[in-house]
Amino acid sequence: MKKLLNEWRKFINESGFNRIKNILQGKVASVSTVGFMTAENPMAQQLSRKENKALNKELMAFMRERGYGPIRIRGRFGNKERSFMIPNITRDDIVEAGKKFSQESVIFGEKTGDNEFVFQYIEGDKTIQRRDVALFDDEVQAREDFFSQERQSAGRKFYIPF
């Protein structure tokens, strides 16, 4: 029974990661844009876990009020971080949220064709860099910093190379 439960958890986790991967590769017809952000550690000032949790709860409410369904993810960008992937968010809304929660940057992606996204690294409301790839390969899986991963996953990572 324990083996069956472990296999089921693995299946569920993989399906979550595969959903994220398919979105970032432009393979989900119902998703035309995506945003990434956290409310943690405003302007790179380290806060307590309790303070960060409260800020992310506020960000979740902000997104839901606007009709978005944020997906909880986690990662490491210098420090461990709990963040969100927000399907179908507008550029204006991700920029507004970044400013509201005093974030140095946010990421916005837009589908530009079949199976293709272009991602923007945005500071304030200015696009600083663009990339047309999200990485998932073995090199990404070995990263110890600067990656994101599906929250329930046992280590399946992804990375947009800004």
At which residue positions do the language-model features occur?
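Proteolytic processing junctions in secreted/extracellular precursors
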Residues: 3-15, 25, 144
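Short, surface-exposed beta-edge/turn micro-motifs
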Residues: 31-34, 80-83, 102-105
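Short basic, glycine-rich beta-strand/loop surfaces that mediate nucleic-acid
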Residues: 82-87, 117-127
